[in-house]
A protein has these predicted regions:
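Conserved class I S-adenosyl-L-methionine
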Residues: 155, 182-199
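Class I S-adenosyl-L-methionine
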Residues: 194, 199-282
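Conserved beta-strand signature within the Rossmann-like core of class I S-adenosyl-L-methionine
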Residues: 175-183
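A short acidic, Gly/Pro-enriched loop at the edge of an enzyme's catalytic core
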Residues: 131-141
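SAM cofactor-binding core of SAM-dependent methyltransferases
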Residues: 60, 69-128
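A short glycine-rich, Lys/Arg-flanked "PGG" loop and its adjoining helix->strand segment in the class I
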Residues: 161-175
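A short SAM/SAH-binding and catalytic strip from SAM-dependent methyltransferases
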Residues: 139-160
């Protein structure tokens, strides 16, 4: 049986993003050009311009000029959260993975403007970054805050946090690594909780907490808040069906600032679900 080439594998895997255009407006292009090879990683591409060429690696100690704890954020957007974290934690190095070029350009410009030397931006597919640029056991924390929920049933195969991704995350995290997640879409939160909890590579330090009446999931189901926030007809569940007896939701991560995106979600009446998982001993 013939094995798939890297090109074939990349095109067969459902992507968690859709790029509609690579064009940047002039101000973003200037920011991109100024940051490329500095704050913005210059990486040779594979089958797509979001993939990494086979065999290419980065020595992160050399890249940052030191040995330090490493935090990776996937889906950094324009960088509100990671720039704040980097400024507050100069002793830690950060990699911001943002597949959309306008966001990556804005983030790189923000890093340069704020004089942050401990952040690098990777405008790449997150799966490619985990598979090819991050050695096993090299990441102290992995952050995924408000990934695209792909809320239509036919698109859910595109969601980033699935069974296959969980083991990729496990590989790159240190034996004491932390995985922090947040979403404002209830069924994606349930999916995250389910697939990560099912892995022997992780355990939930908040197991059983925030269950029952105080669970954000119970609250969403009782009011069908997901539908309400979109202006759709609501179908609240009866109390017995709405009750989340499992819980396991984490308290809000104190270092996660409220971004413009999250504020819009709150204004629309959505609930935020936080999850924290710790790497199990190998």
């Amino acid at each position: 049986m013939r094995s798939l080439t890297e090109h074939q594998q990349h095109y067969r895997r459902p992507l968690s993003f859709v790029r509609r255009s690579n064009r940047l407006k002039p101000s973003y292009q200037r920011a991109w050009d100024a940051a490329l090879g500095n704050e913005l990683l210059e990486v040779p591409h594979g089958a797509r311009d979001t993939s990494v060429a086979e065999g290419f690696t980065i020595d992160w100690r050399e890249e940052f000029g030191r040995t330090a704890p490493l935090i990776v954020e996937i889906g950094s957007g324009s960088g509100e959260a990671i720039a704040h974290a980097a400024a507050s934690n100069p002793e830690t190095d950060f990699i911001a993975v943002e597949v959309y070029r306008p966001g990556a350009a804005q983030l790189a410009a923000r890093i340069r403007r704020e004089g942050l030397s401990n952040v690098r931006v990777a405008c790449l597919d997150a799966v490619e970054v985990l598979d090819k640029l991050l050695p096993a056991g090299s990441v102290d924390e992995l952050w995924i805050f408000f990934p695209d929920p792909w809320h239509k049933a036919k698109h859910r195969k595109r969601r980033l946090v699935q069974e296959s991704f969980v083991e990729k995350a496990a590989r790159v995290l240190t034996p004491t690594g932390v995985w922090r997640l947040a979403t404002d879409w209830s069924d994606y939160a349930v999916q995250m909780r389910r697939v990560i909890s099912a892995s022997a590579s992780f355990w939930n330090p908040h197991l059983g907490q925030r269950a029952g009446d105080i669970s954000p999931l119970t609250q969403v189901r009782l009011g069908d808040l997901d539908a309400a926030s979109l202006g759709k007809e609501t179908h609240p569940l009866p109390y017995e069906q709405a009750l989340d007896t499992e819980g396991g939701w984490a308290p809000r991560f104190a270092a996660r600032v409220t971004t413009d995106f999250e504020q819009k979600s709150v204004t629309a009446g959505r609930r935020t679900f936080d999850l924290t998982f710790l790497r199990s001993a190998r």
